[in-house]
């Protein structure tokens, strides 16, 4: 139901947050 922009943003954040958490 969320807009495409939100879905894309969420996916991008998840992809960036994953490596960051792995590094820490």
Curated annotation (Swiss-Prot):
It comes from Homo sapiens. This is Humanin-like 1. The gene is MTRNR2L1. Plays a role as a neuroprotective and antiapoptotic factor. Induction: Down-regulated 6 hours following staurosporine (STS) treatment and up-regulated 24 hours following STS treatment. Down-regulated 6 hours following beta-carotene treatment. GO terms for biological process: negative regulation of execution phase of apoptosis. The keyword Cytoplasm applies. One of its GO terms (cellular component) is extracellular region. InterPro entries: Humanin. It holds the Pfam family Humanin. It is found in: Secreted; Cytoplasm. Highly expressed in the kidney, heart muscle and testis. Keywords: Cytoplasm, Secreted.
């Amino acid at each position: 139901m969320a807009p495409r922009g939100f879905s894309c943003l969420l996916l991008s954040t998840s992809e960036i947050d994953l490596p960051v958490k792995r590094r820490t």
